[in-house]
Amino acid sequence: MALKEYKPMTPGLRGRIDLRKDEITAQKPEKSLTTGKKNRAGRDSRGRISVRGQGGGHKQKYRQIDFKRNKYGIPGTVRTIEYDPNRSANIALIFYADGEKRYIIAPKGLKIGQKIMSGEMATLDVANALPLEAIPVGFTVHNIELTIGRGGQMARSAGAGALVAAKEGEYVTIRLPSGETRLVNKKCYATIGEVGNEDHMNTSLGKAGRSRWLGIRPTVRGMAMNPIDHPLGGGEGRGKGRHPVTPWGQPCKGYKTRKKRNPSDSFIVSRRKKKN
């Protein structure tokens, strides 16, 4: 999907870079696969802020996505490719032979009218879902399960794709987009190909108002607050006065927060690599 730039006729257009909507074929979602979505504005069940910097934004409907891909042996046809405000990737509406409709994440190269399939006997074509044991080494996959039957949890964002690196015993070695190498049970399902809309990372909102449309509120530095609001607040000038910390006093900027005895450590061959 190509990028679209604008003439600098206003300050907001000067830095704006959008995606061209050439792939999008439908403007309204399938009504039977959408539900209402309440804007939590970063609040928890007590009404207190649990995630800062969220709130407002345009009203959205949630599209129910089929992450499990458990229509085994039933062929489906790609009917539309649509925009989804809840994720960076586009989604595709699938009409199955038994009459059911489902949304899936749209992989790169998916075409209208294309036939897709899930199951052990599915071919190794883009958008087909198979168990990892049936996918050859060297293939790129997305929407990867961590637990058998739970549905895809890894490599689901725009442009994401993981590499099937090796197979040994009950596990398959997967190299994730983050650079982490991980063992996954060979019975877990994954979808062939990488997620589409790969140019999403190259877009630019261009103005603060577009962030507000997306429900993103301004991020305030701790140093700019009062002492009552943040450990780095107050004082004369711009000095921090201590090592940078979160509003709750936990060190940040390099401080490791992962549990020392995380059960998943035994499945991680090598940790993710830092990106320059």
UniProtKB/Swiss-Prot annotation:
Annotated keywords: Ribonucleoprotein, Ribosomal protein, RNA-binding, rRNA-binding
GO CC annotation terms, alphabetical: large ribosomal subunit
Transmembrane residue ranges: none
Cross-referenced SMART domains: Ribosomal_L2, Ribosomal_L2_C
GO molecular function: rRNA binding; structural constituent of ribosome; transferase activity
Biased composition (Basic and acidic residues): 15-31
Ribonucleoprotein as UniProt keyword: yes
Region (Disordered): 1-61, 224-276
Any Pfam family the entry gives: Ribosomal_L2
Subunit structure: Part of the 50S ribosomal subunit. Forms a bridge to the 30S subunit in the 70S ribosome.
Family: Belongs to the universal ribosomal protein uL2 family.
Entry function: One of the primary rRNA binding proteins. Required for association of the 30S and 50S subunits to form the 70S ribosome, for tRNA binding and peptide bond formation. It has been suggested to have peptidyltransferase activity; this is somewhat controversial. Makes several contacts with the 16S rRNA in the 70S ribosome.
PANTHER family recorded: LARGE RIBOSOMAL SUBUNIT PROTEIN UL2M, RIBOSOMAL PROTEIN L2
The name this protein goes by in its record: Large ribosomal subunit protein uL2
